[in-house]
Every structure is written in C-alpha cells, then in structure tokens.
C-alpha cells in the first residue's frame, strides 16, 4: 500500500489541525481516514489481480480457472497446475513419471520399468550392461532382495511390475520429518531414548535432496527405515556384536543438522561419526558397556548407549515418518510479530530482560513486563492476536512450571515452539489464568494437561501427548465458561464436564487405547484401554468435531461431527440435538443423534494403532474400504482427511497412463509399511 495519505493532497491550511485540540474529532479527519481505508482496500484488490495471473501466487478460487487454461480439470491442485507444462514436455521418461507421482501425492516415488526387472533373452544388439544372470549373489546389492530396490530379475507375471510391458510408479506413503537437537531421555547406565517422550521410535534414512528431472536411483533417495540390511547394502560394514560402518559409508556423511541417518552431541560437543556402533540397547538389564570412545545406536528402538568418554547431556538429530501434518513434529508456527510482549525461553542463551531459561520464569517475566508498562491496556487486546507470546526457542526438555494460577493483566497468551524446533514440557502442565485465553502450540507434553476453572479459552495446536503413558487432557469440573479447542493434535483421553460451550476438535487423533511400538522381544507398552471422551466427574461435555479419529468410546451430552471416525462408537445423552454427517459411527447400537450418510460397517482398517508409528491411525490405502471415499468432499474420513491421501492416489491412477509410452500398461503400487 502507498505511504501517501489523502490528507497530503489538501492544502496545508485545511489539512493541519488547529493549535488547540477540539473537544471532538474533526469531521474532516474522519472523512480522510475513511478515504484512506477505502483506497487501501482498492490497492490490495489491484495487487491481488496481478497475483492472480500466476499459479504460484493466485488465490485459491483462481486455481481451477488457470487449470482449465492448461487442460487440467477443476480439482487439480496448485502444484499440479504449476508443473503441468514441464511434465508434459518430458512425457514417456521414468523421471517424469516419478515427478508426476510426487506432485500428485506428495510422496517419494520410484519408476520401475518392467523390462528392466524381468528375465528375457538378451540379443547382441541390446545395449549394455549384459544380463548374464537373474541376480548376482556376490554383489552387495543382494541385501536389497525383497525391497523396492532389489536387483533380481524375476519371471514374467501377467500383472504387477514384473512384466516387460509394464511401467510402475512405486510410492512410499509417508514423509519424513526431522527432530533437530532433541534432548534424549536417560533410562539408566548411560543409556538414552532419543524420542522426546521417551518412547521407542525406530530410525529412518533421510532421502538425498533431488534436483529437477533426476531419478530415485538408490536407497539413499527413499524414506526407508534404517535396518541392518540397509546398512549392508549401502556400503562396507565391519561385523561383530556391534557393527561399525566403513569410513566411506554414505550414512556417515552429511551436515550435522541434516544427517542421512543420525547425528549426536554429548555435552554440546559433536560425537564423531566414526565413534558410532550399531547394536542392541535393551531397556532391562544393562548390556556390556561400550568402549569409552564409542556410542552404540539401536536402530530398531531409537536408543543409544554412550561410552564413559563422552559427557552427559545427549542431543540427537534424526528422522521420523508421518502421514499428515499432525502433532508437534509437524508444527511450523511462525512467530507473531504483532505480539505486545515477547519472552523467549532458551537454555543456551545468556539470560536478559526478554530471555530466560525456564517456562516458569518466562510466565513470571511476561506478567511483570505487562504490569510495568502502563501503555499495555487490556481493552486494546485484539482477537486472533496474542498480547503475550512465550517462544520456546529450544528442542530441550523443559521442566514444567508450578501450577499457573493468577489473574493476568492482558487476556491473550500464546506459548509456541518456532518452526524446526520441538521442545518438550517434561511433566504435567496446570494452567488457570483468570479470564485468559491461552494457545499452546507445537510442543511435546510428557504429563497431563490440567485446565482450571478460571480460564476463558484454551486452543491446542500441533500438540503431542503420550497416550501410551495414560496422559490426558483434564478440565476442571467447574470450568463452566471454558472454550476448549484443538487443531492437528495427537491427544490422549479428554476428561471434561458439561459446560456452556462444547469441545471443538479439528484434524486430531484422540487415543484412548494407548498402544505403543515395541522392539523385537520387548513387551508391548501401554495400559488398559479407556474412553476417548468422557465426563470428568458429573456429565459428559458437548462435542463438535471435524476430521477426527476417536480411538475409544465417546460419551457426550450432544455431538455434532463431520468426516470423523468413532472406532468404538459414540453415545450421546440428548440425541435430538446435533448431527453426525459422513462419519463411521461404530457397529454398536448406542444412542446417538441424527446421522446423514454415516457408515456402521465395515470396521476401519488402519495401518497401525500404535503411537509414533508412521501410519498411526491412518486408514490403510491398499485395501478397498469405503471409508476412503466416505467424507463430505469424497476423500477419506478421520484425522488424515486434511492430507487428501486417497484423493491424490486416485488422481495419480487416473492420470498415470498419460505419461507412459503407447502400448505399455501403467501401474501404481505402494511400498510396504515399515512399522505396524
């Protein structure tokens, strides 16, 4: 917007205010202010018109019109439209097929040419390399047998990728996200669990950055779970009770903040890659201690055993799979530049007036700054804009504050983890700010979340709790006026009583089953299953849900839901109020409100019901289940409705034939899930 005001166009005699301020604002000033506002709106509209000429910057409503100009249907996405011309110029090439699959689904893809993976007689005129055998048992590549990158050539099959006249797009239906410098949890005898919540989490190999028009050529280009076969197939390995990678092994390369596999620091000093060994780190009796200058990494459990030569305080950078933008690992919240008071929590920084080392100190400092500044008035607070912002600029485990119970001067507070950081609150967080609205965004929470009666509102965004340990959201029975909402969270059970406002959930998993991943031979973690939503003491709360998966029975006073999955059913007290639309409501004949296009069968089939699995309560895309198209917009129901996984996969199946040569059959397959 231009910095010129309408008042600048007037003569100074009319524009300048009188020496003595009038008792009431001048009519001329009000008129000029209104003109400036309308001119600003007009300038913004003109700017948007120019932005709508380009697919990268246009508004959402303009995408179908630009798609029509390049011959795509109205439901094409922004990335598909942007790459349409470039992809068409490269039709018929394996790289174009891979790029098409990635654009439509967002997943890593591998183009498999059937004639390259099947047995057939080679003529002298065929280009090298010679096809002398089905598989070379002396090659390191033999360790890839049974994987998408297997070197073996198979007999021809009528269908599937092993047919010379087939071109297959092989997809990995998950993405990797990185935990950077996350503080590990000690489990005794210099052993640590890498995950911020102390649960087992297998390690994955981060794909190499890919240039335009390149191919997924090896296991270094795919988001694979790191196993011993992967270690062997990629480079030299020294065998023994604890494996050691050769000095030229590709998994030892890379920058510390973006390693292919893992990077560690001990006491803020980097652990050299040559110190890493790979073996078992069980959770029971301590195994033999490693040498003083060695660190044993357990790939299957996500644990490390540190030698005596390294200092305490282990931090790790590693990668985990996700199916959607849920939980703290998917948080990408920007700092709000309009916050009136900002306090940063950073354990490694020098404390100052606006930088502290604990959450408790940040809350105290923020309130003190509010009290000391007379220009900060509660009546100037704006909806949607925090008055106080506490930024957790660390990936460490922070001690929880003592129960926070006071009447703040300013009503809107926000506790947020900036993008790329994954801080953990190491215990129960109890909040009771009188009359305040609190937003908690992008953090891991190891304890319960206790909400007091004085709060006016609480908004949870990209929060991850530990349902395996039975952690829950506990709302005070006296919180009659609390407005509780959650978006894109992984929550434990919710316990609240009937209040003036319902609980609002969007794109969340509410897990009352509490199952966890377990290493080979380890007991399955998790306690007894419990209700996902239920009363705290007296009457169950009201519920409004959009795109939520409830694992466990749901009890509510009233329920209004769309595109949800109630794994164990939903029961309401007042069935005449509310409606369930496009949901799976469970097979049990429980009292529930009016339903519209809801399903009671078949039972949902999930990739995994275990917390921290890559397909955690994600519907299995390889099965032909009606829930994949049961949503109000034709997509899948449940917590991953926002990811549009099934829609992208179906769109690829419709368009893939355009990008293979005439006479070839196009197929779409998915790599097997690494965690169940």
Task: Report residues per predicted region.
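Short, glycine/acidic-rich beta->alpha junctions
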Residues: 89-93, 103, 354, 358, ...
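Compositionally biased, low-complexity/repeat regions
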Residues: 1-340
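N-terminal extracellular ligand-recognition/capping segment immediately after the signal peptide
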Residues: 81, 348-429, 444-449
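Detector for repetitive beta-architecture
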Residues: 387-389, 395, 403, 412-414, ...
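Feature marks extracellular polysaccharide-active and adherence modules
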Residues: 344-346, 393-395, 416-418, 426, ...
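Predominantly extracellular beta-rich ligand-binding scaffolds that present long acidic/polar faces
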Residues: 497, 503-610
């Amino acid at each position: 917007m231009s910095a010129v005001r309408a008042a600048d166009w007037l003569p100074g005699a009319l524009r300048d205010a009188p020496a003595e301020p009038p008792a009431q604002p001048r009519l001329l000033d009000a008129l000029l202010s209104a003109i400036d506002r309308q001119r600003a709106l007009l300038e913004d509209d003109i700017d948007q018109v120019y932005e709508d000429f380009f697919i990268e910057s246009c508004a959402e409503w303009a995408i179908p019109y630009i798609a029509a100009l390049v011959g795509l249907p109205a439901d094409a996405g922004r990335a598909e439209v942007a790459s349409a011309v470039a992809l068409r110029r490269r039709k018929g090439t394996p790289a174009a097929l891979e790029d098409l699959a990635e654009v439509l689904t967002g997943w890593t893809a591998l183009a498999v040419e059937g004639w390259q993976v099947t047995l057939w007689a080679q003529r002298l005129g065929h280009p090298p390399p010679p096809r002398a055998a089905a598989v070379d048992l002396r090659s390191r590549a033999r360790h890839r047998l049974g994987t998408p990158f297997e070197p073996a050539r198979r007999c021809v099959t009528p269908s599937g990728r092993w047919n010379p006249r087939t071109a297959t797009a092989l997809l990995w239906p998950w993405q990797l996200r990185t935990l950077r410098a996350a503080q590990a949890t000690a489990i005794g005898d210099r052993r640590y669990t890498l995950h911020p919540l102390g649960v087992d989490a297998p390690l994955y190999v981060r794909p190499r950055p890919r240039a335009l028009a390149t191919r997924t050529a090896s296991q270094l280009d795919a988001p694979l779970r790191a196993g011993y076969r992967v270690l062997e197939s990629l480079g030299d390995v020294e065998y023994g009770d604890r494996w050691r990678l050769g000095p030229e092994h590709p998994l030892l390369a890379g920058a510390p903040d973006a390693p292919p596999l893992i990077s560690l620091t001990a006491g803020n000093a980097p652990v050299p890659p040559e110190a890493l060994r790979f073996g078992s780190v069980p959770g029971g009796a301590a195994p033999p201690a490693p040498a003083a200058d060695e660190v044993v990494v357990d790939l299957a459990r996500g644990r490390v055993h540190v030698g005596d030569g390294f200092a305490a305080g282990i931090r790790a950078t590693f990668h985990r799979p996700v199916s959607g933008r849920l939980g703290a690992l998917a948080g990408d919240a920007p700092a709000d530049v309009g916050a009136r008071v900002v306090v940063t929590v950073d354990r490694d920084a020098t404390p100052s007036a606006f930088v502290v080392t604990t959450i408790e100190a940040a809350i105290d400092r923020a309130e003190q700054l509010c009290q000391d500044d007379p220009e900060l008035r509660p009546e100037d607070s704006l909806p949607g804009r925090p008055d106080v912002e506490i930024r957790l600029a660390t990936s460490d485990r922070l001690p929880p504050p003592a129960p926070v119970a006071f009447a703040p001067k300013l009503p809107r507070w926000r506790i947020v983890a900036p993008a790329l950081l994954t801080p953990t609150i190491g215990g129960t967080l109890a909040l009771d700010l009188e009359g305040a609205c609190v937003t908690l965004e992008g953090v891991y929470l190891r304890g319960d979340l206790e909400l007091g009666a004085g709060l006016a509102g609480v908004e949870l965004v990209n929060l991850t709790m530990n349902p395996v340990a039975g952690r829950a959201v506990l709302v005070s029975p006296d919180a009659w006026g609390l407005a509780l909402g959650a978006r894109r969270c992984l929550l434990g059970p919710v316990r609240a009583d009937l209040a003036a406002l319902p609980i609002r959930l969007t794109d969340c998993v509410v897990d009352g089953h509490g199952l966890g991943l377990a290493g080979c031979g380890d007991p399955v973690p998790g306690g007894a299953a419990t209700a996902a939503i239920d009363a705290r003491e007296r009457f169950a709360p009201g519920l409004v849900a959009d795109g939520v998966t409830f694992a466990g029975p749901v009890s509510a006073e009233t329920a209004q839901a769309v595109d949800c999955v109630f794994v164990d059913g939903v029961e309401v007290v007042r069935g005449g109020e509310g409606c369930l639309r496009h949901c799976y409501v469970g097979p049990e004949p429980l009292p529930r409100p009016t339903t519209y296009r809801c399903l009671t069968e078949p039972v949902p089939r999930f990739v995994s019901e275990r917390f921290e699995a890559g397909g955690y309560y994600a519907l299995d895309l390889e099965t032909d289940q009606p829930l994949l198209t049961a949503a109000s917009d034709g997509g899948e129901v449940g917590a991953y409705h926002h990811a549009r996984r099934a829609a992208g996969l179906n769109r690829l199946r419709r368009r893939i034939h355009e990008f293979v040569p005439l006479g070839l059959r196009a197929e779409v397959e998915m790599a097997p899930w690494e965690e169940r």
